[in-house]
Regions:
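Flavin-dependent oxidoreductase catalytic cores
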Residues: 3-128
Length: 128
């Protein structure tokens, strides 16, 4: 869900609209909202920096009382873990980080000290 269109001068789609929509979506059985924002219109004003869309996921999670997934320049394992453990969102969706590094999940597990138990036939592929 694009939470807002980043065009405040046009009085476009905003957080209040998104909260109302998410309440209705939850009533219809939607389980989780993937929260994004703006960027679809060429003159949108977006201050893109690491985690810049996480507060939007937190707002929807709190105001609409529905699980959310955070997105938006989430690139480091510690950053992703912080978002989950602090309750800012229920999930973290990674796109560009995993396109750049298809082994991102393995790198994150090693960096955060989490052990992944591999099936024996696949274990050699883990480090090959």
């Amino acid at each position: 869900l694009s939470l807002h269109d980043a065009l405040p001068i046009y009085n476009g789609w905003n957080l209040i609209d998104s909260v109302e929509l998410c309440i209705q979506l939850k009533a219809l059985g939607v389980d989780l909202i993937d929260v994004s924002s703006g960027g679809a219109i060429h003159n949108a004003k977006i201050d893109a920096k690491p985690g810049f869309q996480v507060p939007f996921a937190t707002a929807i999670r709190t105001e609409a009382n529905i699980p959310t997934a955070a997105v938006g320049l989430i690139t480091e394992p510690e950053q992703a873990e912080h978002i989950i453990t602090t309750g800012e969102a229920d999930a973290v969706f990674l796109a560009r980080a995993m396109l750049r590094n298809p082994r991102w999940a393995l790198m994150a597990s090693e960096k955060l000290g989490h052990r992944i138990d591999w099936a024996l036939p696949l274990d050699r592929g883990r480090t090959a």
